[in-house]
């Protein structure tokens, strides 16, 4: 390789790709004296992290840092994004997108700590994640060299990766029979590949790993009371819980009712469409609860603007632009609007659906006196509406007259 690298920090998962990256780096970067491994615990599950440090060191790493990012992910990425109302293309709750940027930031911090001069990720050249990682690297550590093996090496398939390890007698638990590509964190789990690559195929039962099939969910609905303070979920059924515990609790409750499944074809940043199945049970409940409060407290023009911001912010997050001035500005604006978002929502979970069925807020703009269809003494002269309608429709009237 033409690059001179002395020390590199690898975003290491212990999976097949990054297991190959370690020996590949050692073989292709002669001056790479130390490979420092960074493992992010974003809530993917204890089974995925078990023995990972020993595996990294046995594969040639001089150091291995296992960093717990669960609280960081929920507090500094998920909750702020919830305040914006961002949902990519109306469906995707951005679980992988947020996690990648939290990992990239922590990876840069480890690189600075150990004095590394390079960063390495295992993202493919066809996906969004390479852009997310490297956009964050550019914003946070533009002086560091970035190594993206998938864009360099001649290994092109899962089989070739397995062959590479076998030739070097490097053990791996991976096999050539893997069906799905999955990504899990504290917010969600995603599923891609296999029969899902044909959008005419329905997802089989083995695709879903987190939520109960709605058909098999309980025949009785379950209700949860969600407390909201300044746009943040603070308690469930009156019980305040630590942030990650609260979300884990909602995940378990909603998953048992089959809530949070989506099957979408999304527009990737790299230009192609891809199909993915996502499970975000707790997040789906939170989005619905916040929507209920938003309906009560935001006036029409503010809510319309917020929806515009939500759409734009979803693209910023999806595209890996968390560490940009625009992202910071939109987060600040959403935080200001959230000051009024206080109250309680009762959500109903049943057979894969969640619905806000009761809501109240001390900042509510809803007035039963004005809204009633019965007798009222508030809007006592309905003829006042005539002047408004004439002005409101004036442009249409002028257009019609001009067309004659």
Swiss-Prot record:
Looking at the UniProt record for this protein, which Gene Ontology cellular component terms does it annotate, in alphabetical order? cytoplasm
What are the protein's UniProt keywords? Amino-acid biosynthesis, Arginine biosynthesis, ATP-binding, Cytoplasm, Ligase, Nucleotide-binding
Reaction(s) catalysed (UniProt annotation):
L-citrulline + L-aspartate + ATP = 2-(N(omega)-L-arginino)succinate + AMP + diphosphate + H(+)
Binding residues annotated for L-aspartate, in chain numbering: 124, 128-129
**UniProt keyword annotation of Nucleotide-binding present:** yes
What Pfam families does the record point to? Arginosuc_syn_C, Arginosuc_synth
> What GO molecular function terms would the record report?
argininosuccinate synthase activity; ATP binding
The UniProt entry's GO biological process terms, in alphabetical order, are:
argininosuccinate metabolic process; L-arginine biosynthetic process; urea cycle
Q: Quick one: which residues bind L-citrulline? A: 92, 97, 128, 132, 181, 190, 266, 278
Q: In which pathway does it act?
A: Amino-acid biosynthesis; L-arginine biosynthesis; L-arginine from L-ornithine and carbamoyl phosphate: step 2/3
Checking Gene3D superfamilies in the record gives: Argininosuccinate synthetase, chain A, domain 2, HUPs, Single helix bin
- Enzyme nomenclature, EC number: 6.3.4.5
Q: What is its main location?
A: cytoplasm
Q: Which domain of life is it from?
A: Bacteria
Q: Which InterPro entries match?
A: Arginosuc_syn_C, Arginosuc_syn_N, Arginosuc_synth, Arginosuc_synth_CS, Arginosuc_synth_type_1_subfam, AS_cat/multimer_dom_body, Rossmann-like_a/b/a_fold
Quick one: which residues bind ATP? 11-19, 40, 122
Q: Report the subcellular localization.
A: Cytoplasm
User: What intrachain disulfides are recorded?
Assistant: none
- Enzyme class (EC, first level): ligase
Residue ranges crossing the lipid bilayer per the database entry: none
Q: Which family does it belong to?
A: Belongs to the argininosuccinate synthase family. Type 1 subfamily.
According to the record's subunit comment, the protein's assembly and interactions are: Homotetramer.
Q: What is the protein name stated in its UniProt record?
A: Argininosuccinate synthase
